[in-house]
Amino acid sequence: MSFGRLESQLRLKVFGRLQVIRQHLRMSNHTVKDGGCLLTKAGCAGVITLNRPKALNALNLGMIRQIYPQLKLWEEDPETYLVIIKGAGGKAFCAGGDIRAVTDAGKVGDRLAQDFFREEYILNNAIGTCKKPYVAVIDGITMGGGVGLSVHGHFRVASEKTLFAMPETAIGLFPDVGGGYFLPRLTGKLGLYLALTGFRLKGSDVQKAGIATHFVESEKLSSLEQDLVAMKSPSKENVADVLDSYQKKSYAAQDKPFVLAENMDKINSLFSGNTVEEIMENLKCDGSSFAMKQLQTLSTMSPTSLKITFRQLKEGASMSLQEVLTMEYRLSQACMNGHDFYEGVRAVLIDKDQKAKWKPESLEEVTEDYIDSCFTSLGSRDLKL
């Protein structure tokens, strides 16, 4: 072998070894920047920063594929004691899933329409079963997919800037990402009300509703994060103590009554119907301004979505999170194969004319046989957790 060739091979070996070392350093001590997330080790914590501020940190498949393996690594890492997830840009934690991309994929039969929901729900389950304390800082807009990244974790910290909603019935979908699990477990019929109407909760009301575990003023969140990552080998109880101490410093918003407090009796009675049609009839018969407003809101939603959502929460009330996510994957694929999801996205997100033409256009035309088919097992294509 010539000296030149030997020298060339040695250079390649050294270069290869350097690449491995660089990769290791990036993962162990530095921020991983590829894709829409920043994954950082800071003190005792693994920190996930959703980093698509121009898109309000909307969750796409690339981000899911970043977060899931890193979450699993941190879960097994003896030097990582908690996980913190937050959003960049100051406006949003995460405004939802990247629905436009999913819609485009579904129209042409692209696998993304399956992969996105499947991998998103697998991530939701990983968050719900995470062995390390998981702290979601939901400062800003938190909707749909953003709720899935937060609500199943141990701790959810809202601020005065938090805006929560599950608005899926307006786009021909349903409140997924485990909505069938956490929504029916809220007080009374609050979860069903939020699911059907897409009502938006703001600030401390997100905690009062039982969605956030803590409320901390936005200006204190940076200091809170510093105190969390500076802890030495913290337990879940230690993390809770720090969060509790910060909540005690945020008095003002907690003195206000819950935004829906004066209407909770009506919500519990009017939304206790055995069908969506019964709920609509209850609202008509009540005749109050509150009832009429809800009737008007529901009349703009996809009738198919309303019926799917009603059944989803009814079934989910007695299911495990894993069973709910399996059910919701079936529902996601039914929506991908239907009409209303594409029409809803067109009307709300693309053309923005807010004039969706639903098919069927009335609740009465949505048959129980069709709803049953949406919940049917996909066999070998079912989500397995």
From Swiss-Prot:
Alphabetized UniProt keyword annotations: Branched-chain amino acid catabolism, Hydrolase, Mitochondrion, Transit peptide
Catalytic reaction equation(s): 3-hydroxy-2-methylpropanoyl-CoA + H2O = 3-hydroxy-2-methylpropanoate + CoA + H(+)
GO biological process: valine catabolic process
Top-level taxonomic group: Eukaryota
Binding of substrate, residues: E120, G145, E168, D176
Major subcellular site: mitochondrion
Annotated EC: 3.1.2.4
Annotated InterPro entries: ClpP/crotonase-like_dom_sf, ECH_dom, HIBYL-CoA-H
NCBIfam families in alphabetical order: PRK05617.1
Family recorded in the similarity comment: Belongs to the enoyl-CoA hydratase/isomerase family.
GO annotations of cellular component type: mitochondrion
Organism of provenance: Xenopus laevis
Name by which UniProt lists this protein: 3-hydroxyisobutyryl-CoA hydrolase, mitochondrial
UniProt pathway annotation: Amino-acid degradation; L-valine degradation
The encoding gene: hibch
Function: Hydrolyzes 3-hydroxyisobutyryl-CoA (HIBYL-CoA), a saline catabolite. Has high activity toward isobutyryl-CoA. Could be an isobutyryl-CoA dehydrogenase that functions in valine catabolism. Also hydrolyzes 3-hydroxypropanoyl-CoA.
Gene Ontology molecular-function annotations: 3-hydroxyisobutyryl-CoA hydrolase activity
Subcellular location: Mitochondrion
